[in-house]
């Protein structure tokens, strides 16, 4: 089903210009949710449909996407661009075993990349936005650092991968909340209503207060500013995938999370579906054989194909 590429895996690419691009960013707020497996699998299936997909490993300091693709290490990685060893992001692109799928491998320079400064980050974001590929999928790191949040907000949409466990759900919720804080701070500064910035930060970080409650308070003081903030949040439409679902309750969990996020964070979260648990995923990883290639008709593969096609052709 997934055609193997006959070109050299290490070749660099000269990419064409001028195509409309979609960027998906896959995160989770917490490690161990399976986001890298989901990112790699989505990219493999999308490439089989569209033949022009680039996968970027932006999990700074802990790159592993190449392993999920059945590849060994390469000489070039994202750090070579960020540290100016190569002038353009496209210079770090390598071919994968899958036709239509390219990879930008993450860097293992933990200390440098995890603390990438603002100017280097903005340079990377500019290059990603102008990168010549029809579809770009970014596997971002864990946690709620500005780097993770800004890569997530760069996308259209950002995709949260969550396990049906309390800690994973809680981390995803607070990751979304951090994204909203980031959006509101940027918007207030852009529109010259900086007097709200400190109030936003103090109020929203109080876990007893919801975004909805806060915005209603703003309406009572400044309706125009509240309208600006509501409008900004309406443009933030993240998506949700439940991974490692084992029970019927796990498969139904997504809609419950959507309802809570809408009620307390005033954001429309789009539930894409659930991916069932399968021990063979770990077996495939140990053997360096991509799961979708080995088990193309499994329930996991069917779920991933459904999610990708829902996202790509909605």
Predicted regions and their residues:
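Extreme N-terminal, non-catalytic leader segments
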Residues: 1-32, 41, 45-47, 51, ...
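Conserved lysine of the Walker
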Residues: 35
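Hydrophobic positions on the alpha1 helix immediately C-terminal to the Walker A/P-loop
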Residues: 38
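Post-Walker A helix-loop "phosphate-sensing" segment adjacent to the P-loop in P-loop NTPases
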Residues: 44-56, 74-75, 184
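P-loop/Walker-type NTP enzyme "switch/lid" segment
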Residues: 58-134, 190, 204-205, 231-234, ...
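Conserved nucleotide-binding/hydrolysis micro-motifs of P-loop NTPases
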Residues: 60-62, 109-111, 143-144, 165-168, ...
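Conserved catalytic-core segment of NTP-binding enzymes
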Residues: 141-270
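C-terminal boundary of histidine-terminating zinc-finger modules
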Residues: 285-300
């Amino acid at each position: 089903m997934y055609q193997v590429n006959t070109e050299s895996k290490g070749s660099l690419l000269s990419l064409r210009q001028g195509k409309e691009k979609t960027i998906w960013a896959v995160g989770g707020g917490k490690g161990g949710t399976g986001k890298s497996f989901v990112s790699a699998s989505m990219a493999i299936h999308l490439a089989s449909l569209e033949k022009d997909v680039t996968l970027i490993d932006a999990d700074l300091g802990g790159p592993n996407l190449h392993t999920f693709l059945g590849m060994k290490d390469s000489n070039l990685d994202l750090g070579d661009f960020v540290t100016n060893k190569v002038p353009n992001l496209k210079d770090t692109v390598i071919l994968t075993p899958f036709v239509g799928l390219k990879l930008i491998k993450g860097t293992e320079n933990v200390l440098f990349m995890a603390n990438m400064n603002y100017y280097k980050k903005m340079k990377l974001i500019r290059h990603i936005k102008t990168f010549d590929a029809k579809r770009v999928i970014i596997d971002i790191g864990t946690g709620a650092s500005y780097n993770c949040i800004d890569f997530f907000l760069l996308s259209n949409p950002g995709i949260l991968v969550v396990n049906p466990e309390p800690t994973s759900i809680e981390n995803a919720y607070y990751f979304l909340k951090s994204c909203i804080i980031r959006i509101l701070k940027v918007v207030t500064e852009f529109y010259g209503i900086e007097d709200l910035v400190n109030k936003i930060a103090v109020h929203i970080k109080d876990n007893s207060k919801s975004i909805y409650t806060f915005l209603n308070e703003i309406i009572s003081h400044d309706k125009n500013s509240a309208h600006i903030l509501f409008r900004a949040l309406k443009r933030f439409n993240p998506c949700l995938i439940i991974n490692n679902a084992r029970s019927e309750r796990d498969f139904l969990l997504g809609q419950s999370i959507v309802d809570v996020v809408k009620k307390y964070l005033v954001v429309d979260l789009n539930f894409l579906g659930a991916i069932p648990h399968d021990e063979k995923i770990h077996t495939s990883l140990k053997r360096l054989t991509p799961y979708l290639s080995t088990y193309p008709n499994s329930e996991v593969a069917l779920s991933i194909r459904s999610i990708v096609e829902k996202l790509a052709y909605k």
